[in-house]
Each structure stands twice: as C-alpha cells, then as structure tokens.
Amino acid sequence: MSFIDIHGHYAWNIDDGIPSYEDARKALELARENRISAIVATPHVTPGVHTKDDIHDFIQRIDDLRMLATEYNIDILDGCELFLNHDYQKALDQNLFIPIENTQYVLVEFDVRKEIGNEQEIEERLYDVQFKGYTPIIAHVERYFKNGLDIERVNGFIESGCIIQVNASSFLGYHGKQAKKIAFQLLDEGLIHVIAADTHRATGSRKPCLNKIFYLLEKNIIIMLFIL
C-alpha cells in the first residue's frame, strides 16, 4: 500500500517550504520511507503578489522537482495552494494559479492566523472558484476555527461541493491543541475527505508523516469500533 499526498511544499526555494535542493532530497527520502508514491507540489500562490512570470517559475521548479523525484520512485504532480485573499478574483480571471495536474481541482486556503471569515469572505469566494469550473479543496480546515469547530459550516462546505483536507501533523498536535481537537472532531463526524502532510521541511514538525498518522488513526478507528 502507498499514499498519494495532495499537499506538499517540496519545490525548493520558492515559498516558505523546503529551502534548498539538498533539503528537497532529504524530504523526498522521508516521503519514500512514508510510502508516499505521488506528491502534488503545492507552492503558495498569493493573488496580488505573484505574477504570470512567477507562476511560470513555479511550474519550472516543479519540473525540476519531478526530475529529482524519479530517483525516489515518486511521481510529482502540478499544483499550488491558492490563497483566497481580497485579490483572489484577479487570480481567477487571469488564471494565475495551478490546478492539480490540469484537472478541475484546486487547493485553496484562507488566513490561518485568525478565525475563519463570514460567508461573504469565505463562501462567496469558494463559489467564485466553482463558477470558474473548479472544485475547491479547502486546505487544513482544522486550523481556521479558533473559537471551536462549527460543524454546520463545514457541512455547508461539503454540501456545496468542496473537498475537505486536514493536515496529518494536526493529529499530532503540531498546530496547537485546538487544531488537534478539531482534527479529531472532524474525523469522528466523518467530515474529512483527504489527510495530507503539508510538508514544509525535511526535519521537525513539518516533515512527511503520513505513515505515522495512518497507524495512529487505524488504531483509533479500531478502538472506536470495539467500543461500538
């Protein structure tokens, strides 16, 4: 059995992710040890900041990563993590983002530093992504609810056609107690479509950890079934 990781910042020296070619090698080695067979490279794209030339450079670096990853028998897929900020419409209109491997899926994120915004700030932006013909995959949903999980809100995302992604590292508490609590709540409620590593480093709390999470959650699910 192997994993496909749809969220990873392995393309070095272009965002806050892997800083160097050497670190990319180390991260890919760890990914292989974690039984990851394919990675969607998702550099951060910030509307109003990144230009058409930047997107071109990102794609070129992803190609470099793809070549490197062949040494580890890992497939690399094109993608990005599109920040739906106040300039998001410009990015949508000018195609300043990278859908996952030219499909209708695009990984999107909001500001993790504060409580998730109101419907006009969030749901309207997700709708606009869909109106352009894309399916939003909402990155690390567990990190947006600073004041506690709003299950109805997440259900609304799903009912509108969005995909819910949770970070593997949140189950380990690497994003704080609140994010860990919400990650397990989402799991218990059956509201997670994808668990991804969101790898940013080759060491520390943001390295590949899907294998560890698989066994952790497998154990928890078995315990839940036993109790039931």
Regions found by a protein language model. Name each.
Residues 1-73:
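An N-terminally biased module of ancient metal coordination in phosphate/nucleic-acid-related enzymes
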Residues 51-160, 164:
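Extended substrate/RNA-proximal surfaces in nucleic-acid metabolism proteins
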Residues 7, 43, 76, 140, ...:
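Divalent metal-coordination and catalytic microenvironments
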Residues 10-21, 109-116, 171:
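Active-site mouth loops of central-metabolism enzymes
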Residues 189-208:
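Short acidic/histidine-rich active-site segments
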Residues 46-49, 84-85, 143-147, 171-174, ...:
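Active-site environment of divalent metal-dependent phosphoester hydrolases
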Residues 161-173:
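His/Asp/Glu-enriched short active-site or ligand-binding loop at hydrolase and phosphoryl-transfer sites
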Residues 209-228:
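Mid-to-C-terminal alpha-helical segments outside catalytic/metal-binding sites
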